[in-house]
Swiss-Prot record:
Keyword flag Zinc: no
Keywords: Hydrolase
Residues of the GP-PDE domain: 5-241
GO molecular function, one term: phosphoric diester hydrolase activity
InterPro entries reported for this sequence: GP_PDE_dom, PLC-like_Pdiesterase_TIM-brl
Protein name listed in UniProt: Uncharacterized protein MG293 homolog
Family per similarity comment: To glycerophosphoryl diester phosphodiesterases (EC 3.1.4.46).
UniProt xrefs under Gene3D superfamilies: Phosphatidylinositol (PI) phosphodiesterase
GO annotation terms (biological process): lipid metabolic process
Length: 241
């Protein structure tokens, strides 16, 4: 367990910048978040890209499916197009580009492997191959999470030294996976805050540190600050400690 609870910017500082973009990550750094949470998919040509959805429709306002497009194709689009404020154009980032710019800057980074809707065969091996380029830094500074426990198991089987968190937002999702398997593979649980509040005994039954998402209430943020089982809160906003 970390000595001090961390505050991670959800998809970067997404309250004031377009989510999962270089601008959102840069502002998270400038506003002194401890780290960021981001989402990773796999392109047609095997590149790890940072985006939440399986398509670019919502963020770039262009109808492309990540797994059917090359990186070059996806780089043509502006992922600030949807945002409430006009910003400089924000092309999609690769995970490598992010690591090159921010791995040394943040204390902790949460990379969500987005295999809950599409499996992206081989994505875990791609992540491992990229991580190896940075020595021990990824093992020390990155927590990999997913709603798809099989994806976490595959990453663990490749290298059991990765920090891994099981992500869930329903009671059914949590109970669908054997508790002993979760304990073997994961160092953390990342429950939706509402599930933790509704079923605290269930969530705490594994005695794993918690990363809570997504905090939008300052009252709840300070409430969870007092919870010794919470190692990190993931928020769209910057709350003052």
């Amino acid at each position: 367990m970390l000595k001090r609870q961390l505050l991670l910017a959800h998809r970067g500082y997404s309250d004031i910048a377009p989510e999962n973009t270089q601008l959102a990550f840069e502002l998270a750094f400038q506003y002194r978040f401890d780290g960021v949470e981001l989402d990773v998919h796999l392109t047609k040509d095997g590149e790890l890209v940072i985006i939440h959805d399986e398509t670019t429709t919502r963020t770039a306002l262009v109808d492309k499916t990540i797994e059917l497009e090359t990186l070059a194709s996806l780089k043509q689009d502006d992922h600030s197009a949807f945002f409430k404020f006009k910003t400089q154009p924000q092309p999609i980032m690769t995970l490598k580009e992010f690591f090159d710019q921010y791995l040394d800057k943040f204390q902790l980074i949460n990379v969500e492997i987005k295999t809950d809707q599409k499996e992206y065969p081989g994505i875990e091996a791609k992540i491992d191959a990229l991580a190896q380029q940075y020595g021990k830094k990824v093992i020390e500074k990155v927590v990999f999470s997913s709603f798809n426990f099989a994806s976490l198991q595959r990453l663990y089987d490749i290298n059991p030294n990765y920090q891994i968190a099981f992500l869930f937002w329903t009671k059914k999702q949590f109970q669908a996976v054997d508790a002993l398997k979760i304990k073997q593979v994961c160092q953390y649980l990342h429950p939706w805050t509402n599930i933790y509040e509704k079923f605290p005994d269930m969530v705490l039954s594994l005695q794993l540190p918690l990363g809570l998402w997504t905090l939008n209430s300052e009252v709840k943020f300070h409430q969870f600050r007092q919870d010794r089982m919470v190692y990190a809160q993931i928020a769209n906003k910057k709350f003052e400690v």
